[in-house]
Amino acid sequence: MEQLHFINPETALILVLLSSLLFAVIGILYSRKYRGYSNYLTAGRKTGTLSLTSSLVASALGAWILFGPASAATWGGIGSVIGYSLGTAFPMIALIYLGKKIRKTFPSGITFTQFIFHKIGKNLFKSILLLSVFYMFIFLCAEVTAVAILINYISSVPLWTPAALVIATTLIYTLYGGLRASILTDNFQFLIIIILLLVCMYNIFSSDFISYQDITNNSGNLLSGKYIPNYTAGLTFFIAVAATNLFHQGNWQRVFAAKNYEVLKKSLKLSFLIIIPIVFFMGITGIIAISVDSKVNPDLAFFSILLKDKSELLYMVIIILAISLTVSTVDTLVNAISSLIVVDGKKINENLKSSNGLVILLSIIALFVASKGFSILYLFLLADLLCCAAVFPVFYGFYKRNLKERDLIISVITGLLLGFLLFPSPDFSKSILVGILLPFDLFPQIVTSSLLFWSFLLATLGPVIVIISYDSFKRR
């Protein structure tokens, strides 16, 4: 990725350090008044509507929104924008119903894996525990890498420096204060994120180089109902993003942290309504960017139009926005991983120490990945596939009493096998079935050009068909 070097490295580092330290100080000072495992893991189960809403939104919106939606829109069109928006927000609606079920069954619960263990069985519990930790670790790497690349892009600061500052300051207050600290800092980060996004929105839409006519003339296909990727990309992002977020323990922690179910329900509805327009706006900037410059780097689509005038103030806004987005997500991930490890053990005190050690180790690995600028997109897609295969069996199992653990595991394996047959190779040119087992020419273009879509679709629908067929067979 090219570098702008518009802000000198010292200024960029000062902004990163001050922003990160601000959240660390707030988190530590607040947490000193609220000690104990209940506050650390569930924030005392006393979180109100405004606080819970802002925490849910801030946790859902990481630095990925600065890159992902706009990049996808440059080739996936308006469909990918809608899919990304709904996929990010949909878990909030799903948690209204799933949250009610799990809070009623386990009023003193902490993790969703507890429910799986008691309701379904030990083997599926272990698999989902590993899946959840794997997904959140990949998410952690992606967030730290994204902010490191962004700061490097606009100021030439070495990748490891902002990554180390963000990880270190976040770990300090998160491992000390737990969920209480995370939710409080989320409240501040939410306000900063909303204000700075409004600043970005105003600057983009008040620019004289953007017009609807230019967009329709230069990128009309991205808005067309006849453009197939509008549908395949939209469904791909919806399925993948929605499925993975249901396995995000950070969301489930907030389900248990709500003061009562009415607070939870209202907060989730508000979060849904706030998330959709934010992600939609970020996606639309990709369509605008590609219409202004057909050769734009997709990963930089949002920045290419926001920073077109090279305003130093806007560069500073971007740095503060990126840090707020990253820290809000990283502290959620750290808390979530820690809670899974703690609750899985019998002795909470000993497990809290071991969980902190493991979280620090994972953070060091994430720092290494970020310092090298490695792309972990393929691992992210792999985690998406695993979640797609597991999402229906696991959450359907929340409600069905007569389903055996063995049958649910078989359905997950079926989904994985079907998904892996069409899961694209690292260069996205072929899959196990298309191009390896069978010749490429045997398949229509709609399959060969959208392998990821068909992979996710089969991984999701395969278990549904298996379970429904099994239910029908048992009724005979």
Annotate each language-model stretch with its function.
Residues 1-476:
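Membrane-embedded helix-loop-helix hairpins and adjacent transmembrane boundary segments
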